[in-house]
Amino acid sequence: MDHTIVIGAGQAGLAAGYHLARRGLPFTVLEADDRVGGGWNHRWDSMRMFTPATSLGLPGAPFPGDELFPSGAQMAAYLSSYAQRLGMDVRTGVAVDGLFRDGDRFQVTAGAATFTAANVVLATGAERVPNVPALARRLSSGIVQLHSVDYRNPAQLQPGGVAVVGAANSGADIALELAASHDVVLCGRHPGHVPLRIESKAMLTVFPLIAFTWNHVLTRDTPPGRRSREKLLSGHGTPLIRVKPQDLADAGVRRAARVTDVVEGLPVTADGEVLDVANAVWATGFLPGHDWITLPGLDSAGFLDNDRGSVTGQPGLYVLGQLFQHRFSSHNSVGVVPDAELVVGDIARRAARAGASVRP
């Protein structure tokens, strides 16, 4: 029977693995990290999920424990346990560096290793390559610089002020934590905020409705969904979820405009303010990082154009976990499971057309 290679052992890749196993389709999961869990192994220590634990579980395994909003480390541990429980063929420490087509098959390369498959699922998610502005290279060598993916806790920074560049959720969370030990300026456009506390009874009560809206209303099939997708992909980001503007103000975090220049080694904002800081944390998001794919289909933003996960013009190639891939929640735990079911459904139909016996 035709084999499927799944690239990435985060929640998207393991959700695909679950559906492939359920249908009796052979597959192998390749993970660049030395542990299952993908990017959840690389979050700051105090980071907490925005999604309640009750909505984080993958099929057949509710999220364990009594934490309402688990940490990134707890999410990674859950995913590792999930892969073991289902007996998935996951190969860690395999950094894929090439993908090309060879007739009706794909060749996936990782160093000296080559894997051949009829289907490839790119489940590397929306956070593959840190997006650090080019101007960061012009900052003084005396300024400690970290991207949010490398930030763990305040002990990594030196005494003195901190510019947190990027004012969406990661930037706001990190700025609030750093404010207890440093003078912090948070740079960037205010993205708005969710008015309710996510820990509140009201929010927990309405979360199932929110999840339904993310999955079934805000999709590429609906006008509201298409408008939301355009806004999200244009870099507007999502509203602040846990940290509120008043929290930042109460903690002494100062707001400033976007950083657009560097003068004499110091960051300068769009309105000309020079920030005399000793540290800079770049909470500036990520790039898709698909430059290792030698196939047509990448759009101008570096995303693979797809229809419900099936890459346009490349039969057998699929994506999972991309930002607003099909629905608002495609890049998080709420949306990857239904997206994975769509992708594996198409793989199963391809296998059936080739004469394979596939479980429904």
Language-model regions, residue ranges each:
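Redox-cofactor-proximal catalytic regions of oxidoreductases
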Residues: 35-60
